[in-house]
Structure formats: structure tokens, C-alpha cells
């Protein structure tokens, strides 16, 4: 049973042969204080020792200390499964089914929460929001050096229309009520996350089918103007990047209409060029 004085959140990590990347992610989850956590790891039958790491973590989470205080005191539940799946988004759907928290957050292997009170602070600022979102810091995959804030920066106000210019919020910095979290559409192999976020936000918006714009506050969407997560820089290959652009274009045409999407992508291309050549362009 959840405690109304604490956020009860399911953190879902999907893995396949993550190697040593999984351990800092699990550690950052275990270090969270002031929050009730249901931690779910969905592994795709890894062959690199991941199962052994999961077993070891399950044995050690009880009694770990952070700054001399019990990390969870019984408020962390850890569950995992390791079995074949049909890809990343199929595994994420499994995680949604397994999740028992009031909220859901997806955290990749190698990604870490910014500090031990990052989730508790969200709840202190605003209890019961439908969505919480914030900034993400990109870190180097080797060594963990901070490379800068993920861009584009998230908007001050977020609704489903905000994503017409691309993925303006990192999914690792997006916490949504579990009852509002729709399944991922498995027809998309690379960019199902932006389709998912658009559909989840659109379902919150009573004016989604009309011209009126509803404010983030009215939708129950809370913006935390700070870093919530550190995530690994892992660029796509050039071939996969082309496939991602094509798939994303189809997704956004579906949601915003072909002509509007074509015009929106004009700005996306301009923004991409400016970001490469103009220092500190957001």
C-alpha cells in the first residue's frame, strides 16, 4: 500500500548484455531516500553475467546506508525477469505490466538519478501531479565526464503539441502516473518513445482534438527546472540515424498532419545546424 506522504514509483530498467553499466544504475536507485520504490529490471536473457549481478543486488539492497541513514527501510521492492523478448519496446511493455507503483520512470542501464533525493524533492514540490519532467545531463560513456545538458532543453510548459519539433524531454527525466502510461506501439522499432510520450500527453489533454491549448498546470504536468538524471551519450550509427529520422517523420505526420510536420521539420533541420555551429544554442 502506498503512503500519501511519499511518492510510490516503479523504476523500470530494460537490459540486454549491459555488462558493468547496470551496477551504477541499480546503485542510484537503491540510494533514493524519502520515496517508496518498486524497482523492476526486464532483461532479455543476457549472457554476460547480468543475471548474477541481479541476484547479487537482490541480496544486498537490504541494509545499505547512504550518509549513515538506511536507504529504504523496507520501502524498496526489487523484482526482475530474464527471458527472450521481441526487442526494446516489447521489454518496456513488460515492465509496465510488472510495475506496481503509482508512477513509472524508465531508466536505462548506465543512466543514474541525479542525487538521492531527486524523486522525493519532486513530491515535496507538488504531490499527485500526472507528470513530472525536468532536465537531463549527458555524460561520457567512458569516465562519466559531464558533456552538458541534453538539448533541446525541455520547455517550461509541456503538452502533446510541444513534441511537434522533436523529443524535447528525455524519457529518463519523465515520470508519469502508471494509470496514464500507455503501452508502447511495437510497429516502431527505433522511435516508439516519442510516439509514446505524445500519446500519453495527448490523453491528458481534454482539448487535444480541438484548437484550444490547455496549460501544463491544468493538465497536471509539473516542470522541475533542474537536472533529474544523468544519461550516457550513445550516438546512433549513421545508417540507424537515417532510419530513426524516417520513422520519427512518419510518427509525427501521424500525430500532427503531413503538411504541418513538413513545416515543423524545416525548423528541426535549422535547429540542428545552429546547434552544431552556434555555441550554447539551446
Predicted regions and their residues:
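Nucleotide-sugar donor-binding/catalytic module of glycosyltransferases
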Residues: 1-238
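Short, charged low-complexity intrinsically disordered segments located at boundaries
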Residues: 58, 239-244, 276-282
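Short, Lys/Arg-enriched charge-dense amphipathic segments
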Residues: 63, 156-160, 212, 244-255, ...
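Catalytic core of nucleotide-sugar-dependent glycosyltransferases
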Residues: 226, 231-233, 238-260
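Membrane-proximal basic amphipathic "stem/tether" segments
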Residues: 249, 253-282
